[in-house]
Amino acid sequence: MARRLFGTDGVRGVANVHPMTAEMALQLGRALAYIVRSGPHRHRIVIGKDTRLSGYMLEQAIASGICSMGVDVMLCGPLPTPGIAFVTHSMRADAGVVISASHNPYQDNGIKFFSRDGFKLPDELELQIERLVLDAGEDDAGAEEFRALRPTATRIGKAKRIDDAIGRYAQFLKTIFPKELTLDGLTVVVDCAHGAAYHVAPAVFEELGAKVIPLNVKPDGKNINDACGAVHPESMARAVKRHGANLGLALDGDADRVILADEHGNVVDGDAIMALVGRDLLARKALAKRTVVATVMSNLGLERALAPLGGKVVRTAVGDRYVVEEMRRSGYSFGGEQSGHLVFLDHVTTGDGVAAGLNVLAVMVREGKPLSELARCFEPFPQALVNVEVREKRPVAELPGVAKAIAAAEKALGAEGRVLVRPSGTENKVRVLVEGPDAKRARALADGIAAELRQAIG
């Protein structure tokens, strides 16, 4: 069924413009509260947010919707997305709500939901919420009850703040770092993107012994992700060189992903992190089924890095939720995305930038090697990416010229490369990715496929 509100990471848009309005947030809160109600006990939902100006408006609206259904609210305030997932699970709440647009600019905002076990809400429940909100639940069992449910008196939900949410999450993060190791003597640059991790991230690394150089830790509601953080790691990389640091981390606005820089200021992306951590886990026989889960966007260099140690890569659709779904379904323990979403399922339930940084630092300390040396195991294949604007999105099978160009490119590359043609989830564009050992050849093949796309549907 086509989604009308939810994308791959919740509901998102420009704040105060449909669907990211206070009215919609209230209705989403009512629908979420309705589907988690079961049994006579008092139900509770955790709400957290990043540092956007519009977060206050949406927080109050969604809390009002939840309370109007007789469900209590626990407000965390600014806290990373993985922190809200952790608090939801650890406090045995019935669901969690994150108000954030992740790496987007401050004008945008979003709402995403977590189940009581700390994982993102399954597709079927998101679709049920959509139907309740957009169709007033006309086709759902219990729709009449949803429309009529208006608790009164003491049955109305209450909202209260969790004053120690940051402390709870910080304490949990420190348990991820091995007790026999220490960060004493290491200098770490931490770019918090003026986002949700501005309190917790610097504190965690400092309490584990590192000298911390904090960057972008003064949110004003408008500066989140502004020329900083995981999407713009350049200033973090420069700070690493300037301070002679051992490692730099750039988190995004909700701190569910991270991009690193080595001691020379060279940027280390999610693929390289998966390669070096995957090799460490393989060497210690700690990687479930000797497999790393990545998406179709990850570089072929990842397979090449893991193969000498007997490691494999399983690929999913783009989106960290699909990585996690595959990990849970098949019993894998580690995976992520090139963009820096990294999931250590033995510890966390979703992408966690701080947890990823701690795991990389553990490898550095355990091996006694700098990040530049560890990351050398990953040699990315040249990639050519072309974004083609199209008037409509149609299956490749319906476009003979495009299908022929793809087949020819795949034949030319053989086992030494790959071709990926996929529509954008948010724009009228089709993305053409060609990967191979020769950059010029990859570009020529990508341009050829793009030309066929423009001729067919451009």
From Swiss-Prot:
* GO CC, alphabetical: cytosol
Catalytic reactions of this protein? alpha-D-glucosamine 1-phosphate = D-glucosamine 6-phosphate
Q: Which is a GO BP term held by this UniProt record?
A: carbohydrate metabolic process
Going by the record, the broad EC class of this enzyme is isomerase
* Residues holding Mg(2+): 102, 252, 254, 256
Question: InterPro entries annotated for this entry?
Answer: A-D-PHexomutase_a/b/a-I (IPR005844), A-D-PHexomutase_a/b/a-I/II/III (IPR016055), A-D-PHexomutase_a/b/a-II (IPR005845), A-D-PHexomutase_a/b/a-III (IPR005846), A-D-PHexomutase_C (IPR005843), A-D-PHexomutase_C_sf (IPR036900), A-D-PHexomutase_CS (IPR016066), Alpha-D-phosphohexomutase_SF (IPR005841)
Keyword Phosphoprotein belongs to the record: yes
* Modification sites for Phosphoserine: 102
Is Isomerase given among the entry's keywords?
yes
Q: How is it modified after translation?
A: Activated by phosphorylation.
Gene3D superfamilies assigned to the protein according to its UniProt record, in alphabetical order: Alpha-D-Glucose-1,6-Bisphosphate, subunit A, domain 3, Alpha-D-phosphohexomutase, C-terminal domain
Q: Which GO terms describe its molecular function?
A: magnesium ion binding; phosphoglucosamine mutase activity; phosphomannomutase activity
Q: Name the UniProt key words of this record, in alphabetical order.
A: Isomerase, Magnesium, Metal-binding, Phosphoprotein
**Active site per database record:** 102
> Which SUPFAM superfamilies does the annotation name?
Phosphoglucomutase, C-terminal domain, Phosphoglucomutase, first 3 domains
Q: Which HAMAP family match?
A: GlmM_B
Q: Report the protein's function.
A: Catalyzes the conversion of glucosamine-6-phosphate to glucosamine-1-phosphate.
The Swiss-Prot or TrEMBL record describes its family as follows: Belongs to the phosphohexose mutase family.
What this protein is called in its record is Phosphoglucosamine mutase
Q: Which organism is it from?
A: Anaeromyxobacter dehalogenans (strain 2CP-C)
* Gene for this chain: glmM
